[in-house]
Amino acid sequence: MEWIQSLPKIELHAHLNGSIRDSTLLELARVLGEKGVIVFADVEHVIQKNDRSLVEVFKLFDLIHKLTTDHKTVTRITREVVEDFALENVVYLELRTTPKRSDSIGMSKRSYMEAVIQGLRSVSEVDIDFVTASDSQKLHNAGDGIGRKKIYVRLLLSIDRRETTESAMETVKLALEMRDVGVVGIDLSGNPLVGEWSTFLPALQYAKDNDLHITLHCGEVPNPKEIQAMLDFKPHRIGHACFFKDEDWTKLKSFRIPVEICLTSNIVTKSISSIDIHHFADLYNAKHPLILCTDDFGVFSTSLSNEYALAVRSLGLSKSETFALARAAIDATFAEDEVKQQLRFIFDSASPEHV
């Protein structure tokens, strides 16, 4: 399905640290092995595998946590992730990451995010726009290169479910301070079995009151009370929605909250047993707003083109239906109106090729 590769695409649920190239992971892990921080032989085969088990996925996440603790590495992986998305014709990317603090190496939440921004600045393989359109001083490196790919990148700061209310509030305030470098929203993610909704609600409400967009990992595990509370909060989007009951679907659909669909991730993590029973089909047939996403393309050995191919095979979508699905994602982005207008132009310019 080469036409899917060339289709303009929008990615709205991508975790920075889960989207690292295998080759980069291998290189960084080898260095850690030489330093005696890890046993390289224990992780080498996991990195090189394409079809990873759930146990191996978690092992990889543990390794990534150890690898992404210095500013230089954060900058490098940010640059590579953006370039990888752009090369498969992703024209707009919302990249999410949890600002990290590591006192031992002098890393604060702010310095971590500054390393991410430096990664955006250092992108050279493609043209990139990562500053909100209202900012008069464009910091992107778009050099009017004819034939060069261009990608719009916006950032979401993630609140980890292990955090306290105070720490969550700190992340929201940092997001507000970094709006001029493309931060457009807040994500709530992390181990869904950890933390209480009431812990994060004050920070999320503060973010909403200050016009930051909100997306929530919702329904990753069975937790009816939390799912209802999250939906009542009326976030701008939710991710996954794997363990919804009928009343949850009813509320979601009545509120028209867009859903970030991560097919491969849901199957690998066994949140959904088979793509044949995935809720993607029901939402699509109900004409509910949804967006196909990768979640962690490195860890789950996928790509956005692959996610579209899965959807096409699963539902038997035509080229024109697939194009319409990809274009509809524009309305769910957290981008400013000027960028949405540019994205519509990009899709409409490509439509004769794909319809």
Swiss-Prot record:
Catalyzes the hydrolysis of the free cytosolic methylated adenosine nucleotide N(6)-methyl-AMP (N6-mAMP) to produce inositol monophosphate (IMP) and methylamine. Is required for the catabolism of cytosolic N6-mAMP, which is derived from the degradation of mRNA containing N6-methylated adenine (m6A). Does not possess deaminase activity toward adenosine, AMP, N6-methyladenosine, or N6-mATP in vitro. The keyword Zinc-finger does not apply. Pfam families: A_deaminase. This is N6-mAMP deaminase. It is found in: Cytoplasm, Cytosol. Changing D295 to A/N: Abolishes catalytic activity. GO terms for cellular component: cytosol. It comes from the Eukaryota. The record marks H240 as: Important for catalytic activity. Belongs to the metallo-dependent hydrolases superfamily. Adenosine and AMP deaminases family. The active site is at E220 (proton donor). The lineage of its organism: Eukaryota, Viridiplantae, Streptophyta, Embryophyta, Tracheophyta. N(6)-methyl-AMP binds at H15, N17, H65, T97, T98, P99, K100, D160, G190, E220, D295, D296. Its cofactor is Zn(2+). Keywords: Cytoplasm, Hydrolase, Metal-binding, Nucleotide metabolism, Zinc. One of its GO terms (biological process) is nucleotide metabolic process. Its main location: cytoplasm. InterPro entries: A_deaminase_dom (IPR001365), Ado/ade_deaminase (IPR006330), Metal_Hydrolase (IPR032466). Monomer. Disruption phenotype: Slight reduction of root growth. 10-fold increase of the ratio N(6)-methyl-AMP/AMP in leaf cells. It catalyses: N(6)-methyl-AMP + H2O + H(+) = IMP + methylamine. The keyword Cytoplasm applies.
